Amino acid sequence: MAEPTGLLEMSELPGDSSVPQVGTASGVSDVLRGAVGGGVRVQEAREGPVAEAARSMARMPGPVPGPIPSSVPGLASAPDPHQQLAFLEINRQLLFREYLDGSSMIPVRLLRDFEERRRLFVEGCKAREAAFDADPPQMDFAAVAFTVALTASEALSPLAD
């Protein structure tokens, strides 16, 4: 392997270097050689001034924090946001009803008419649902055959996978 020349010859000998020499062609091989056979360079790199500076920066001042006790409030002790939003929605509905009841701009008879129409609509929906559940409409034979054929063709299709 060709060692880079120039600065190396002027400053120090190749064996005395504490930093692995990186050349354009053999940058990785020097590090691998140190890791495989000559452990001197690898150990020097672990004990060099850069490694010491990195270790000192990694140390935290003060004691190492331990596990967080369960009595400390955190994310688990936060209230459920859905429950809070449901509470806000109930309050909003109550405030709206109070506004409508107390507002002189909307006549009371008009409000009662809206409530009566809403009540009739809900009762009609419930009656239609009960009638459908009691006697569901029969599907004709052609629609049943089409549904079965479509389901079978989808199950056998290579696109189903």
UniProtKB/Swiss-Prot annotation:
InterPro entries: EID
Protein keywords: Developmental protein, Differentiation, Myogenesis, Nucleus, Repressor, Transcription, Transcription regulation
Record GO biological process: cell differentiation; muscle organ development; negative regulation of DNA-templated transcription; negative regulation of myoblast differentiation
Chain spans, region Disordered: 1-26, 54-77
Role description: Acts as a repressor of MYOD-dependent transcription, glucocorticoid receptor-dependent transcription, and muscle differentiation.
UniProt remark on domains: The C-terminal portion of EID2B is required for nuclear localization.
Protein's recorded name: EP300-interacting inhibitor of differentiation 2B
